[in-house]
From Swiss-Prot:
Function of the protein: Cleaves peptides in various proteins in a process that requires ATP hydrolysis. Has a chymotrypsin-like activity. Plays a major role in the degradation of misfolded proteins.
UniProt protein name: ATP-dependent Clp protease proteolytic subunit
Record's keyword annotation contains Transferase: no
SUPFAM superfamilies: ClpP/crotonase (SSF52096)
Chief subcellular location: cytoplasm
Gene: clpP
Matches recorded under Pfam families: CLP_protease
Gene3D superfamilies: 2-enoyl-CoA Hydratase, Chain A, domain 1 (3.90.226.10)
Single GO BP term: protein quality control for misfolded or incompletely synthesized proteins
Lineage of the species this protein comes from: Bacteria, Pseudomonadati, Pseudomonadota, Gammaproteobacteria, Enterobacterales
Quaternary structure and interacting proteins, as annotated: Fourteen ClpP subunits assemble into 2 heptameric rings which stack back to back to give a disk-like structure with a central cavity, resembling the structure of eukaryotic proteasomes.
Annotated active site: 111, 136
Length: 207
């Protein structure tokens, strides 16, 4: 996860989003596929985590809470990570709202994606069989005067410490283990993610 934003060179082509047509008493009604899935309380977090994406995801969660505060929300994650502040706005909303947020990793959940994956409701965090998870410490690149660089370096160390504390809380690992294991990029398979405490089980097929 990065301390400052990075441009996603593989931004999705929204023209390729399929439409779903439903018959209603008033005739046909068409939705884009993601809006239709939102009716089923399914949200997708795909691509780099950045401010625009975070705004959309938090808005969807708040909308679903307003519709029904008792029903679970399902957050599907396929992300290489992204900006810490954007990710933390999603994290705080997940913890703030009344419905449980079930997280499901498909493809990959790396960096901030992994952090959000493990932040789901206990017992409701899943990986699909061939997905992968990667955890590491926050990344930062700064330029400018030496004093400013020092200020940013101190801030990123504070962010690192806070995120390690939260990871320890959600995984059940000790803070020392989290600090050691995130010192470098650490990749985990779906099964290893269960063993580590990042998720609760591997989804192979719907019941």
């Amino acid at each position: 996860m990065s301390y400052s934003g990075e441009r996603d060179q593989f931004a999705p082509n929204m023209a390729l989003v399929p439409m779903v047509v439903e018959q209603t008493s008033r005739g046909e009604r068409s939705y884009d596929i993601f809006s239709r899935l939102l009716k089923e309380r399914i949200i997708f977090l795909t691509g780099q985590v950045e401010d625009h994406m975070a705004n959309l995801i938090t808005a969807q969660m708040l909308f679903l809470e307003a519709e029904n505060p008792e029903k679970d929300i399902f957050l599907y994650i396929n992300s290489p990570g992204g900006v810490i502040t954007a990710g933390m706005s999603i994290y705080d909303t997940m913890q703030f709202i009344k419905p449980d947020v079930s997280t499901i990793c498909m493809g990959q959940a790396c960096s901030m994606g992994a952090f959000l994956l493990t932040a789901g409701a206990k017992g409701k965090r899943f990986c699909l069989p061939n997905s992968r998870v990667m955890i590491h410490q926050p990344l930062g690149g700064f330029q400018g005067q030496a004093t400013d660089i020092e200020i940013h370096a101190k801030e990123i160390l504070k962010v690192k410490s806070r995120m390690n504390e939260l990871m320890a809380y959600h995984t059940g690992k000790s803070l020392e283990e989290i600090e050691r294991d995130t010192e470098r990029d650490r990749f985990l398979s779906a099964e290893q993610s269960v063993e580590y405490g990042l998720v609760d089980s591997v989804f192979t097929r719907r019941d």
